[in-house]
Amino acid sequence: MFDRFLDNYRNPENELANLLYGKVIDGLVKEERIKAEIKTIEEWEEKAAHIRKKFIESIGGLDFDKCNLNIEYTGEIDQGRYTIKKVVFQSLPGFYVTANLYIPNEIDGKIPGILFSCGHSKPAKAEPKYQRAAIELVLNGMAVLAVDPPGQGELIQMPDRNDVDWGVHEHSYMGLACSLAGMNIARYFIWNLIRAVDFLTS
């Protein structure tokens, strides 16, 4: 805010932030220029493939082997027009994912499947507003799989740690460990969802 009054002297307090901000702005300007140059579907598909490749590389890849999901149903709640099935599956060996599967009680052939990825709430799939959304979808004839992200719902990883809270704090704590190992925690979040799609289509 006061940079124009520095008379070409440096402001070390904000220098790193300003450098990073400048890089972000440069990147956004470049991206806008590249998007404006895309004229055909083929060019768009080529650009999309390039972005996808770079993104997957940036998180350390998604080159896991698809193991058996080892699906377990731990209970169900019959709500009349639909049933909620409590599900546990493994996205990787020993890496458990908890979810609720909402299924209409009257199914005639194949039905659409919705993967519901929960936002930042401690109860995750049990959050009332997320349940309401899933119920609206199942009442309209769709199967809905609501999945707990790591660090939320039944997947709180460090419940006995007073210095690491649920959600973003856990994500950051586990994410730092991943970064130190040369990878990104996002690959595990994404892989859980990829395997959730496998579950939905099985």
What residue spans do the PLM features occupy?
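Short, flexible loop/turn elements at secondary-structure junctions
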Residues: 89-93, 103-105, 118-121, 151
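Cap/lid segment of the alpha/beta-hydrolase catalytic domain
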Residues: 109-202
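Short low-complexity stretches enriched in small and charged residues
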Residues: 8-12, 44, 165-167
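N-terminal hydrophobic targeting/anchoring segments and the immediately downstream early-domain regions
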Residues: 1-35
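Non-catalytic accessory segments flanking enzyme active sites
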Residues: 22-102
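Charge-dense, low-complexity intrinsically disordered segments
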Residues: 11, 35-46, 180-183, 187
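General secondary-structure edge motif
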Residues: 4, 23-24, 35, 69, ...
